[in-house]
A protein has these predicted regions:
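N-terminal targeting/anchoring "stem" of glycan-biosynthesis enzymes
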Residues: 2-3, 26
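Extreme N-terminal starter segment of soluble prokaryotic enzymes
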Residues: 4-9
Length: 247
């Protein structure tokens, strides 16, 4: 995703999907509307930019993936999976993809839920539609830490090999003992309405952690981390770097 306002596409394939787009689009004036030619007239009067296409939607997917940060399809989940499958790269490159059913009852983040922001956008969209967000990402369902994007809204940068992020994320969602060490940065990093899970213990100094008691360490610091420490902890360490202007 870009650092600027996300580029959002609302995509309709069916008549009922187009009706849902026409209903929600005025409340999302920054979003662009993408519909088949035969539904373009129904979008007249919207404050949004409206683009229409002819032929099959599958021919438009590559451009959608290139031009937008969030793509919302108003169609069945299965149809979207088949449409986007040939274009998938990685969670670091793919846009967020969200599906809304034709009746606007359910909003489902399908792709790039965390890194691409699809989970958060699905919840926002569901609130506007009066729909149910269907989140399946383990850290969201379990109301625990999203290791790969923790502190992102505060400007924190993650420092760790990808294998560490994968391993530590698994330890967190599996409820294993986790040490969270915060030596720097803003303290309002826990944004859920629920309490911090009991398997996560907070420390103020790395030296206070008995490493043998924890499956992983999340360390918010400005200190240099010696290579020997990365090696000693193997795949158990993730470091977060807060901006210099934070405490």
């Amino acid at each position: 995703m870009t650092a600027e306002a996300p580029r959002i596409a609302l995509v309709a394939i069916t008549k009922h999907g187009a009706e849902q787009v026409a209903n929600i689009a005025p409340r999302l004036p920054q979003a662009e509307v993408i519909v088949a030619d035969k539904f373009a007239a129904a979008m007249a009067g919207l404050p949004n930019t409206v683009n229409s296409y002819s032929g099959a939607l599958r021919a438009q997917i590559a451009v959608l993936f290139s031009d937008y940060d969030q793509i919302v399809f108003f169609v069945s989940l299965g149809a979207v999976v088949r449409l986007i499958a040939p274009h998938l790269q990685s969670k670091d490159e793919d846009p967020g993809v969200v599906v809304v059913d034709d009746a606007a009852q359910f909003v489902i983040p399908v792709l790039s839920g965390h890194v691409g922001g699809a989970n958060a956008y699905a919840e926002q969209l569901a609130a506007l539609l009066g729909a149910t967000p269907v989140l399946t990402t383990a850290s969201d369902v379990g109301k625990t830490l999203p290791v790969d994007i923790l502190g992102r809204e505060l400007g924190w940068n993650v420092e760790a090999p990808k294998i560490n992020l994968t391993r530590v994320s698994a330890h967190v969602v599996n409820g294993e003992p986790i040490a969270f060490v915060q030596e720097a940065g803003a303290r309002n990093w826990w944004t859920r309405a629920t309490p911090l899970p009991g398997n996560i213990r907070v420390f103020e100094r790395f030296e206070d952690v008995e490493l043998d008691r924890y499956r992983a360490v999340l360390w918010v610091t400005r200190r240099e981390v010696p290579q020997a420490l990365w090696q000693a902890l193997e795949e158990r360490l993730v470091v977060y770097r807060p901006p210099e202007d934070q405490a």
